[in-house]
């Protein structure tokens, strides 16, 4: 394992924090130190990108909001979030890396519903669209003073409210509960609650214990947490990819994803047995 040269990493971060150019040097060290983890993350990414490219034109010529093109866009959203998570993990910004996993799980929930009940999925997405549009227009209250813009906003809100009617958006908990098997809701809650939102637990990660039993606030990086962050990201993307593959009827996806998940499990076990490490 490569050790960092700086005796005190804070010196390199004193001026620009985690935007310091030094972090790019450390990034290569982290990737080398956790080579197997990052190779697995990229192997899954290559497969996921190939699925997206192969089915990018699904539903071409039909309505843009039909099930097939909607599913492709949902999967694209998951791919982008996965990319962000891996890039953050490469820089040992592990809290943020797991926080980026949340939309991957949400994409997986929607893809599973699109695969099992496309009519319901499209209706729920329509409800979500109009409810958020109403909420967005109501933000005008924070910016009073322009009567013309205010009037136009009221009209837009009324149009969306009429289309929304008495319908209410489904919660992620209810959506996940309606899906077959284990959609990964527990992992989603962990990614959302512990990492995605400011909480006492997430604040506890930003402190370094000193020799006098005190603590010192720090920004990071958190190298030893990289495997955990990558586990969250790979697990979420593998689930979501399985749902997308089922929707577009890719026959060999289960075998490929099962092999990737076996490697993920083996890496997790090896990391647990090795215990804390890193520079």
Listing of model-derived features with the role each one plays in the protein:
Residues 1-279:
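A cross-kingdom marker of C-terminal helix-rich interaction/assembly modules
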């Amino acid at each position: 394992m490569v050790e960092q040269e700086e005796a005190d990493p804070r010196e390199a971060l004193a001026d620009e924090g985690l935007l310091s150019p030094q972090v790019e040097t450390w990034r290569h060290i982290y990737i080398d130190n956790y080579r197997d983890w990052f190779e697995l993350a990229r192997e899954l990414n290559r497969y996921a990108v190939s699925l997206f490219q192969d089915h990018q034109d699904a539903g071409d010529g039909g309505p843009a909001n039909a099930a097939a093109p909607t599913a492709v866009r949902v999967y694209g959203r998951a791919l982008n979030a996965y990319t962000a998570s891996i890039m953050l993990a490469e820089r040992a910004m592990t809290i943020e890396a797991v926080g980026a996993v949340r939309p991957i799980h949400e994409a997986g929930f929607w893809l599973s519903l699109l695969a099992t009940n496309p009519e319901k999925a499209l209706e729920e997405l329509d409800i979500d669209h109009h409810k958020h549009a109403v909420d967005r227009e109501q933000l005008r209250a924070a910016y009073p003073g322009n009567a013309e813009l205010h009037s136009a906003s009221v009209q837009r809100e009324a149009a969306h409210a009429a289309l929304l009617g008495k319908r209410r958006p489904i919660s992620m908990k209810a959506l996940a509960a309606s899906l077959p098997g284990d959609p990964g809701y527990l992992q989603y809650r962990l990614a959302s609650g512990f990492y995605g939102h400011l909480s006492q637990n997430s604040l506890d990660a930003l402190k370094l214990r000193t020799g006098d039993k005190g603590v010192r606030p720090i920004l990071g990086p958190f190298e030893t947490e990289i495997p955990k962050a990558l586990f969250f990201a790979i697990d979420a993307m593998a689930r979501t990819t399985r749902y997308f593959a089922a929707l577009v009827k890719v026959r060999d996806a289960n075998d490929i994803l099962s092999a990737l998940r076996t490697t993920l499990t083996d890496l997790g076990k090896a990391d647990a047995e090795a215990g804390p490490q890193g520079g």
